[in-house]
Amino acid sequence: MSRYRGPRLKKIRRLGALPGLTRKTPKSGSNQKKKFHSGKKEQYRIRLQEKQKLRFHYGLTERQLLRYVHIAGKAKRSTGQVLLQLLEMRLDNILFRLGMASTIPGARQLVNHRHILVNGRIVDIPSFRCKPRDIITTKDNQRSKRLVQNYIASSDPGKLPKHLTVDTLQYKGLVKKILDRKWVGLKINELLVVEY
């Protein structure tokens, strides 16, 4: 299954708030219909929705998500927490959390167009896994700095997670440590994703 490129508000109405997908919010009370399902289908639907939240928020394909679940399953710690740590340490997500891009798809585009450096080297793979003490900067040219400048100026420094620091004057971000569960930017029950 390929990456979702369709109407984003439709997904937000169905799954709830997905800050990485878009900044838009649906109108209040639009198309809120109550549906009643049997108990067994209800459990399946809840697990599917949690999985879809994760997929659409981080912009993953089905295959990528399965690969991350497989890697997290091999770890000795809680599979759900390791899964969220893997997803949060992706380069496109870190750019979004630093405030260098308005959404995760916007951050993917910055990375794909070679505007981002990690430890002084150009990285053009959005799924690049960042490690503690990685320094993320923009290229030195004016165009790259201008793209990031608007987003950094409008971002809220109070929303910056504790595992990241940002220097707004030099357009530089630093990954201090691996993310703690309470700083994940999405309200999700990761155990239901692993069970699915």
Swiss-Prot record:
Pfam families: Ribosomal_S4, S4. The gene is rps4. One of the primary rRNA binding proteins, it binds directly to 16S rRNA where it nucleates assembly of the body of the 30S subunit. With S5 and S12 plays an important role in translational accuracy. Residues 15-43 are annotated as: Disordered. NCBIfam families: PRK05327.1 (NF003717), rpsD_bact (TIGR01017). InterPro entries: Ribosomal_uS4, Ribosomal_uS4_bac-type, Ribosomal_uS4_CS, Ribosomal_uS4_N, S4_RNA-bd, S4_RNA-bd_sf. One of its GO terms (cellular component) is small ribosomal subunit. It is found in: Plastid, Chloroplast. SMART domains: Ribosomal_S4, S4. GO terms for molecular function: rRNA binding; structural constituent of ribosome. PROSITE patterns: RIBOSOMAL_S4, S4. This is Small ribosomal subunit protein uS4c. The keyword Endoplasmic reticulum does not apply. GO terms for biological process: ribosomal small subunit biogenesis; translation. Part of the 30S ribosomal subunit. Contacts protein S5. The interaction surface between S4 and S5 is involved in control of translational fidelity. Belongs to the universal ribosomal protein uS4 family. Keywords: Chloroplast, Plastid, Ribonucleoprotein, Ribosomal protein, RNA-binding, rRNA-binding. Gene3D superfamilies: Ribosomal Protein S4 Delta 41, Chain A, domain 1, RNA-binding S4 domain. Residues 89-150 form the S4 RNA-binding domain.
